[in-house]
Regions:
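Glycine- and hydrophobic-rich flexible loops that cap the catalytic core of alpha/beta enzyme folds
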Residues: 199-227, 235
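Long, charge-rich, low-complexity alpha-helical segments
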Residues: 278-292, 298-312, 316, 356-473
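C-terminal lobe and adjacent flexible extensions of AdoMet/dcAdoMet transferase-like proteins
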Residues: 231, 235-373
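A short acidic, Gly/Pro-enriched loop at the edge of an enzyme's catalytic core
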Residues: 124-132
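Conserved class I S-adenosyl-L-methionine
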Residues: 166-193, 209-215
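A short glycine-rich, Lys/Arg-flanked "PGG" loop and its adjoining helix->strand segment in the class I
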Residues: 148-160
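N-terminal charged/capping segments associated with class I S-adenosyl-L-methionine
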Residues: 4-125, 172-179, 471-473
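A short SAM/SAH-binding and catalytic strip from SAM-dependent methyltransferases
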Residues: 131-145
Length: 473
């Protein structure tokens, strides 16, 4: 590849081909730049290993594709931290892809190719067979025809043994919020301005309706409680894209599995790691009741009804090979993990719908202490193997630690660009780690690192932690 990244090459036909998707999606405002750590190869590999399924072989290279890549933050960070991979990002909004190309060019990322196309046009491209195909959130924002074209892309371009990550708004967790979404979408149609302004106008009307005693709104968890909290941490563009998409529709797990079974895909597990362990999220009586349901898809549906699941991160495969319990154990012990926070801030407990899972013991503390000096393979930590596995999986489920790559790569240039693009008006809080992931940093911490501002006491341990992480251990 030449010194000029393929991410810079603009095809004038792309804008026209992408525009065919526009009426079925919010396109007048750009979505906020986001990083999805669940889409990392190491994270998806761990999900496969938990299910005793062989992850893709990556030693000699691999291919990864994101459908609905937005402004390319996830794709760029993954490409930069996995130089042996061939990365592709596809999004039907030309503005998103233009931003993604600028980010990749400025960061010097040469193994990322970006396409401003809808899924139907992308399916016809001459692309590699992908070991990983990821689609974060988009599956429940698009209509049935667009979901079909997404599946056609997967069917055509998934490599043998490849993994597919699809996350989506799920039922029945959204059931109480359906009237809220329907009403905000309907009210927004008569408002003026762009989608952000339309959502704001619709929300203002709904606040007056709620105050007057509109039961369908006041019984909505999103409207009654969550929306105000979300406004403090999410971009206004999020609300426009989340709630004003014409085809917005939360899906039952059985609907998604049935659609993907039509192209030969079967469920592997959940990228929400704790959801792979009934003992973490279900009470004993719930586990007993579910045990009576033999069909795995119906069992998962009943489980979602128990938990009122509202978001799923499902991993699928067509033909990934099963592995023995012995191989699974060995590969899990060989997995490299990284700490996601300073050691002093770690909480050795995880609240779940089934109660609080506690792992405040010597083995968990040993794992965290070892990882405080940088990423390590689990086998490098002293302790009984079975205890190490059990506690590492609890720590990973609580996102105290993450599965990462064992080989560190330089990320200074990428982080310098991310820092330059990070402004108060348009926050970009993510900073890459050399081990193949990125962390979202607190605003005050980013100001301290950039400008030397006083650091709040709650963040005192972070600069040293990040310095060690940046050094790759």
């Amino acid at each position: 590849m030449s010194s000029k990244s393929r991410s810079d090459i603009h095809n004038p036909l792309e804008d026209r081909r992408a525009s065919s998707f526009a009426p079925r999606y919010v396109t007048d405002v750009a979505y906020a730049p986001t990083f999805t750590h669940f889409a990392a190869p190491a994270w998806l590999d761990l999900t496969a290993l938990l299910a005793a399924v062989a992850p893709p072989a990556r030693r000699s290279g691999f291919a990864w594709c994101e459908l609905g890549c937005g402004r390319g933050v996830t794709a760029t960070i993954q490409a930069a931290t996995h130089p042996l991979g061939a990365f592709h990002g596809i999004d039907m909004m030309p503005g998103h892809i233009a931003d993604a190309r600028r980010l990749a060019e400025r960061a010097g990322v040469a193994n990322l190719t970006l396409h401003a196309l809808d899924f139907a046009a992308a399916a016809d491209l001459d692309l590699p067979r992908f070991d990983y195909i990821v689609a974060h959130g988009v599956y429940s924002w698009i209509d049935s025809q667009s979901r079909e074209t997404l599946r056609h892309f997967v069917d055509r371009h998934l490599a043998p043994g490849g993994l597919v990550y699809i996350s989506y708004n799920a039922m029945p967790g959204w059931a109480a919020d359906l009237p809220f979404q329907y009403l905000v979408h309907a009210l927004a149609q008569s408002a003026v301005g762009d989608s952000i302004a339309k959502f704001a106008a619709a929300e203002a009307t709904m606040r007056r309706l709620g105050a007057a005693g509109t039961r369908a709104l006041n019984n909505s968890p999103i409207f009654a409680r969550e929306l105000a909290k979300q406004r403090k941490r999410l971009s206004p563009a999020y609300f426009a894209h989340e709630y004003l998409a014409p085809a917005w529709q939360p899906l039952y797990v059985t609907e998604v599995r049935t659609e993907l079974a039509a192209i030969g895909l079967h469920a592997v597990g959940s990228a929400t790691l704790r959801d792979n362990f009934d003992s973490f999220v279900l009470r004993a009586a719930q586990r007993s009741a579910l045990h009576e349901i033999v069909d795995p898809d119906l069992r998962e549906l009943a489980r979602d009804c128990m938990l009122l699941t509202r978001f799923r991160r499902d991993v699928f495969s067509r033909d990934a090979a099963p592995i023995s319990a012995r191989e699974r154990r060995g590969r899990l012990l060989g997995q490299c993990f990284a700490l996601t926070q300073p050691e002093a801030l770690v909480k050795y407990a995880m609240p779940t719908p089934g109660g609080t899972v506690r792992f405040d013991n010597d083995v968990s503390h040993s794992i965290v202490t070892e990882l405080a000096d940088g990423p390590r393979r689990l086998v490098q930590v002293a302790g009984p193997a079975d205890d190490l596995l059990a506690n590492a999986l609890a720590l990973a489920s609580a996102e105290v630690i993450r599965p990462v790559e064992s080989d560190a790569v330089p990320v200074g240039a990428l982080n310098a660009v991310l820092d330059e693009l990070d402004t108060e008006a348009a926050p970009l809080p993510y900073r890459a780690l050399p081990c193949g992931t990125a962390l979202a940093l607190d605003t005050a911490l980013r100001r301290h690192l950039r400008e030397g501002r006083r650091l709040p006491p709650r963040l005192v341990g972070w600069p040293g932690f990040l310095a060690r992480a940046a050094a790759g251990g």
